[in-house]
Amino acid sequence: MDTDLQLALNTLKKNFSGDREAQKALLLLERKIKAQALDDEVIPTDEEPFPLPEDIKIKKKAFALFADGACRGNPGPGSWASMGQDQSGKVLFEVFGVENQTTNNQMEIQAAIEGLLELKRIMGSTLDCEIFLFSDSKYVVEGMEKWIPEWKKRGWKKADNKIPENLNRWQKLDEIKGYFPRLQFIWVKGHAGHPQNERCDQLANHALDEIDFI
């Protein structure tokens, strides 16, 4: 954050030290300013291009997405990150964000949501091609490939008739999946030398490092 802006915020905090609502508003403003700065920041990466996944090398047209979530405390402050590549290997985007109080599973789902939303924004109406979304979360991959079809048959209920955890996020992800008729979710082992997964992990943790949650 700009030094003058930080000094101004600190002065306001001091002047309104006895006003609880003002302190909350200033804290929210500070977080939003830091989050915007993160959006504008380019986080360095190695100069070597990311290797193209085998799944899309043999396709006429395909895209690869990578998604990862992080959480400190679980529940606690969390973050998500996603990146996308086209068939030439070009990195189309990197996006990331933070939430104050969340869980690791929620951030894993959110990473997939945000990656698909960004790809949809870039592609516009050209969605009928193969999309491979790679995640190190079996929770996300099995949820999308196995659990959700069964939940929907039961009116979004599990076999024990209980409502699935994180239902709103699952429903949002399922809704977005509808725009991608040839979307596949693929599990990759985390922290095992997968370059794009490691990059998303780096982005997510960088976002958490830069935002001070109270």
PLM region spans:
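Intrinsically disordered, low-complexity linkers and terminal tails enriched in Pro/Gly
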Residues: 35-59
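Phosphate-ester processing/binding pockets and catalytic centers
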Residues: 38, 92-94, 100, 124, ...
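RNase H catalytic domain
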Residues: 70-74, 113-199, 208
